[in-house]
């Protein structure tokens, strides 16, 4: 994926506090147009909170988020949803609806009394279903889908929004390895700027850049192999790590062992 240098989403000294506890503190981050940015860190490091702040679901306690150079607080919710789509870990969806119904929900930000459902909305839904390879399952009921199929449908719903930025909060959690690889491959092929929170550091190696959070602070940012070095992994995750080279394709992979 080619990376342009213009930031599309920025945060400056971004902080969030809840019930007296500091969850995120002083985060400075620029997301570049066209890039894939991985957010990694131990449990409770602030990854999910940062994603909620970047899309306006949470309001910052201090600092600022800017979308295309304008304060996020200046945008209406509808305007944000036309630019940013979010795929959460656990998205609630009624079991009775079909796959197509779920994907059609992505058109909501574009509909109004003056702009009712049209052929263009049908076209966007069809494109989204094709992008996530669910056209053949479009009439299936939600309750009959596997975990991987549900997650693909959620990504399809997000793509039907026609976003320029896609935020994903650990989209491969609770999926088997086949579905993990399928979802990550799908995300990498999407023609949007992507910010993705991940637990698996080897998955983060496939992104353009990696941001490491620890105890609510951004402690490292850069190219994956420049950031995910043994010293940082020991300090942040409490594990020893070294790189291996895959003889099949020459790619580098992390191998871990317990510290101590």
At which residue positions do the language-model features occur?
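The feature captures the beta-strand-to-loop junction immediately N-terminal to the Walker
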Residues: 40-42
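Helix-to-loop junction immediately C-terminal to a conserved catalytic motif
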Residues: 55
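Conserved ABC transporter NBD signature motif
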Residues: 63-71, 80, 140
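Conserved ABC ATPase signature
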Residues: 116, 141-145, 149
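A short, proline-enriched helix->beta-strand linker immediately N-terminal to the Walker B motif
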Residues: 160-164
């Amino acid at each position: 994926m080619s990376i342009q240098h213009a930031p599309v989403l920025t945060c400056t000294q971004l902080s969030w506090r809840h019930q007296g506890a500091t969850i995120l503190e002083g985060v400075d981050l620029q997301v570049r147009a066209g890039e894939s940015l991985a957010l990694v860190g131990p449990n409770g490091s602030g990854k999910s909170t940062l994603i909620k702040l970047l899309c306006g679901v949470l309001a910052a306690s201090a600092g600022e988020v800017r979308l295309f150079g304008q304060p996020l607080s200046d945008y209406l919710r509808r305007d944000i949803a036309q630019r940013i789509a979010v795929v959460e870990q656990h998205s609630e969806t009624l079991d009775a609806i079909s796959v197509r119904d779920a994907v059609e929900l992505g058109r909501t930000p574009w509909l109004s009394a003056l702009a009712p459902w049209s052929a263009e909305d049908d076209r966007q839904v069809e494109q989204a279903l094709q992008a996530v390879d669910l056209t053949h399952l479009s009439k299936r009921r939600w309750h009959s889908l596997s975990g991987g199929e549900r997650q693909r449908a959620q990504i399809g719903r997000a793509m039907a929004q026609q976003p320029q930025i896609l935020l994903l909060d650990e989209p491969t959690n609770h999926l088997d390895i086949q579905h993990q690889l399928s979802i990550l491959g799908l995300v990498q092929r999407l023609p949007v700027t992507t910010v993705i929170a991940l637990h698996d550091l080897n998955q983060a190696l496939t992104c353009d850049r990696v941001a490491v959070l620890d105890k609510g602070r951004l402690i490292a940012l850069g190219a994956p192999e420049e950031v995910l070095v043994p010293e940082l992994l020991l300090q942040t995750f409490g594990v020893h790590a070294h790189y291996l080279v895959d003889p099949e394709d020459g790619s580098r992979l992390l191998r871990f062992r317990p510290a101590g």
